[in-house]
Amino acid sequence: MILPAPHVEYFLLAPMLIVFSVAVAGVLAEAFLPRRWRYGAQVTLALGGSAVALIAVIVVARSIHGSGHAAVLGAIAVDRATLFLQGTVLLVTIMAVVFMAERSARVSPQRQNTLAVARLPGLDSFTPQLSAVPGSDAERQAERAGATQTELFPLAMLSVGGMMVFPASNDLLTMFVALEVLSLPLYLMCGLARNRRLLSQEAAMKYFLLGAFSSAFFLYGVALLYGATGTLTLPGIRDALAARTDDSMALAGVALLAVGLLFKVGAVPFHSWIPDVYQGAPTPITGFMAAATKVAAFGALLRVVYVALPPLHDQWRPVLWAIAILTMTVGTVTAVNQTNVKRMLAYSSVAHVGFILTGVIADNPAGLSATLFYLVAYSFSTMGAFAIVGLVRGADGSAGSEDADLSHWAGLGQRSPIVGVMLSMFLLAFAGIPLTSGFVSKFAVFRAAASAGAVPLVIVGVISSGVAAYFYVRVIVSMFFTEESGDTPHVAAPGVLSKAAIAVCTVVTVVLGIAPQPVLDLADQAAQLLR
C-alpha cells in the first residue's frame, strides 16, 4: 500500500512559510557570511521578509471567501481573524526589528572603516557576546572590538513564525508546537541585555522555568481533552462535548489548557513573571514581547473559546469573569506603587489583559471584533512607549545605561519636549483618555461586554481605568511639571528609521482615537472564525 502524500495549501500558508524561510536564511547567514556582512544581511532579511509576508497576508485575505479555509489536513485555519492577527503581528515585527537594529554598538576608532558594526549613535541594548561571563575579560574585549549580536534577528523571526501559527492552529497539537516555537527564542532573547547582565539572565531563567511549567500544564490539558473527546481538532472537540453528558474530564483538561494560555497573555494569577522579565530583558525585546506575544496568545485563546468550548459556555464564563476582575484589579493596584517605569508598564500590561478579557467574555461577534481592535491599538501604543523608554539613558549618556527610575525623570519633558509629548500620548492612550486609541478600544470591549450582560465586569473595568490614570499622569507630571535634578537622564538620538517608527506609533495612536471607523470596520469583517 502506497502512503499518499498530504495535500499542502502553499498559497494559504505563504505568509507563515515566508517568515520561517527568512528565519532559516538568517541562520545560514550566521553560519556562512563573514562577520562584517552579517549585520546588514540580517536586518535586510528581517525587514524585507516581514514586509513580503505582510503583502502575502493581504493577498491571501483578498482571496478568502466565506468563513475561510482549513489547510494541512485541517491543522491550520486560514480565516479572516487569522489573517488580521497575522497582519498585526507582522506590523509589530517590522517596528520591533527597526528598534532592535537601532541598538547597535558604537563604532570604535580602530574600526571606523569596516562594516563589522552599524554606525549608530551608541544605542546598544544587547550584549556583544552572549557566551562571555558578565564582567569578564572576554566581554570587555568584545566591547572594545565593537562586536554586535546579530543572532537575535533569526531568533526573532523564528518567534514570529510561531506567533503566526499560534492563532491559526485548528488543533491542539499544532497549537502546542506553535507555542513552543514562539516561546523558546524569546527565552534566549530576554537574556541578551548589555547592561545589568545578571538581571537579564535572571529574567530569562525565570521566564524559561515558568514557561516550561505552563507548557506542561497545557500539554497535560491536551491529553485530558483527547481522552475525553477522542480528537485534537477544535471543531471535533466542540462536537464531542456537545454530545457528552459527563464533562468532568473535559473540564479538567480545559482548566489545564487555560493555564498555558493565560500564562502567555499574563493574566492573574499567572502574571508573576511579567514585571521581572519586562524589567530585565532588553527594552526592544520587552516591547516586542508585550505587543506581539499578546496578539498571538489572545488569538489562540479566542479560537479555543469561540470554536471548541461553546458547549461549556456556562462553565468557563464565570471562571473568566473572576480572572478578568482579578487581573484588572491586581495590575492596576500594583502599578500604583512602582517607581521603575518598565515595571510600571509591566503591571499596566497586566491590567490591559483584564480589559481585553472583558471582550473575550462577551462571547459574541461584537466582543470578537472589539478584542481584535484592542489588540491593534494596544500594540502600537506599547511599541512606541517602550521604544521611547529605551532612548532614556543615564545622566552620563553612556550606551546601554538605560535609566527607567521614575525619580530621575523629573524635567525630562522640558529637556526633550518632543519625546515627552510622544510618551505622554502613549500613556494617555493606556489610560483610555478620549481622542486616543485607548478610549475607543476600551469603549468597544466594555460595550460588547455590557451587551452580553457583563455589566458588573464593565463597572470594575471603568473603576480600574480611573485608578490607572493616576500612575500614567504621575509620569507626565514628573516629566513636565517637576524641576529637573542633577541626575536627570539624557534622551539618546535615534536613527531615521527609529524616528519614523516612533512617529508611526504616535500617529496611529491619535488617528485610531479620532477616526477609528476604518479599522473598526476591518476588525468587524475579520470577526469570523472557521468553525
From Swiss-Prot:
The transmembrane residues are: 8-28, 41-61, 81-101, 146-166, 172-192, 208-228, 250-270, 282-302, 318-338, 350-370, 372-392, 418-438, 453-473, 500-520
Q: Name one GO molecular function term.
A: NADH:ubiquinone reductase (non-electrogenic) activity
Task: Kindly list the places in or outside the cell where this protein is found, as annotated in its UniProt entry.
Answer: Cell membrane
Listed A to Z, the keywords are:
Cell membrane, Membrane, NAD, Quinone, Translocase, Transmembrane, Transmembrane helix, Transport
The broad enzyme category this protein falls into is translocase
Q: Give the GO cellular component terms, alphabetically.
A: plasma membrane
Give the bilayer topology.
Multi-pass membrane protein
Which cysteine pairs make disulfide bonds? Answer: none
Reactions accelerated catalytically:
a quinone + NADH + 5 H(+)(in) = a quinol + NAD(+) + 4 H(+)(out)
Tell me any Pfam family this protein matches: Proton_antipo_M
Any single GO BP term: ATP synthesis coupled electron transport
Q: Does the keyword Translocase apply?
A: yes
EC no.?
7.1.1.-
Q: How does it assemble?
A: NDH-1 is composed of 14 different subunits. Subunits NuoA, H, J, K, L, M, N constitute the membrane sector of the complex.
Q: What is the role of this chain?
A: NDH-1 shuttles electrons from NADH, via FMN and iron-sulfur (Fe-S) centers, to quinones in the respiratory chain. The immediate electron acceptor for the enzyme in this species is believed to be a menaquinone. Couples the redox reaction to proton translocation (for every two electrons transferred, four hydrogen ions are translocated across the cytoplasmic membrane), and thus conserves the redox energy in a proton gradient.
Family from the record: Belongs to the complex I subunit 2 family.
**Classification via HAMAP family:** NDH1_NuoN_1
Q: What is this protein called?
A: NADH-quinone oxidoreductase subunit N
Q: List the source organism.
A: Mycobacterium tuberculosis (strain CDC 1551 / Oshkosh)
